From Swiss-Prot:
This is Glutathione S-transferase theta-1. It comes from the Eukaryota. One of its GO terms (molecular function) is glutathione transferase activity. The gene is Gstt1. In liver, highest expression found in central vein limiting plate hepatocytes. In lung, expressed mainly in club cells of the bronchiolar epithelium and, at low levels, in type II alveolar cells. GO terms for cellular component: cytoplasm; cytosol. The lineage of its organism: Eukaryota, Metazoa, Chordata, Craniata, Vertebrata. Homodimer.
Length: 240
């Protein structure tokens, strides 16, 4: 049976899975679950992921719902090149270290930045208090600095001389604030050079394909009132 991936490329972890699968020629059937239409909240999608979140994966009768778990499953099952998730214990531990750190730090601040700058005011028509936006951008700056100083340092990639899962997860996170109009790479030459290396390692065409939605997100139309009412209870937690 064909591997099934339930994705919306608006979502940063969905983009990471999409890039990884495409780059490694992993055959899959993609089901687009449109977050801005509330399709992830449907009873039909709840049969795939009861938590009603993307990404999700079905491999025959086996389902998996967390992005890092899906990436590791694909890396193990399809025997991808070693640099993605190295066999070397310490190199693998560095990938794991980044994946463990980013979930409540860089991912959170990148997500909040996009929502505070674009999704709430443009898509949902809800204004964010200036002091809240300022705090969000300050938090983003702190986490980007940690990424640069603690993880990237002076290496070509986050874990060494070759691209890994850590780099794909990190770059897809950073493209969220980029899509929201934040110049996160300006004034950061090491990070900007890393960005160019990741884009080249992935392939520019695939990189742009995966990020087409997020790079056009500021042009999204306002939400339908019914959709807005459906989405608001879940997304309000992002501005607390």
């Amino acid at each position: 049976m064909v591997l099934e991936l339930y994705l919306d490329l608006l979502s940063q972890p969905c983009r990471a899975i999409y890039i990884f699968a495409k780059k490694n020629n992993i055959p899959f059937q993609m089901h687009t679950v449109e977050l801005r239409k509330g399709e992830h909240l449907s009873d039909a999608f709840a049969q795939v992921n009861p938590m009603k979140k993307v990404p999700a994966m079905k491999d025959g009768g086996f389902t998996l719902c967390e992005s890092v778990a899906i990436l590791l499953y694909l890396a193990h099952k399809y025997k991808v090149p070693d640099h993605w998730y190295p066999q070397d214990l310490q190199a693998r531990a560095r990938v794991d270290e980044y994946l463990a750190w980013q979930h409540t730090t860089l991912r959170r601040s990148c997500l909040r930045t996009l929502w505070h700058k674009v999704m709430f005011p443009v898509f949902l028509g809800e204004q964010i208090r200036p002091e809240m936006l300022a705090a969000t951008l300050a938090d983003l700056d702190v986490n980007v600095q940690v990424l640069e100083d603690q993880f990237l340092q002076d290496k070509d990639f986050l874990v060494g001389p070759h691209i890994s899962l850590a780099d794909v997860v990190a770059i897809t996170e950073l493209m969220h604030p980029v899509g929201g109009g934040c110049p996160v790479f300006e004034g950061r030459p090491r990070l900007a050079a890393w960005y160019r290396r990741v884009e080249a390692a992935v392939g520019k065409d695939l990189f742009l394909e995966a990020h087409e939605v997020i790079l056009k997100v500021r042009d999204c139309p306002p939400a339908d009132p019914v959709i807005k009412q459906k989405l608001m209870p879940r997304v309000l937690t992002m501005i607390q």
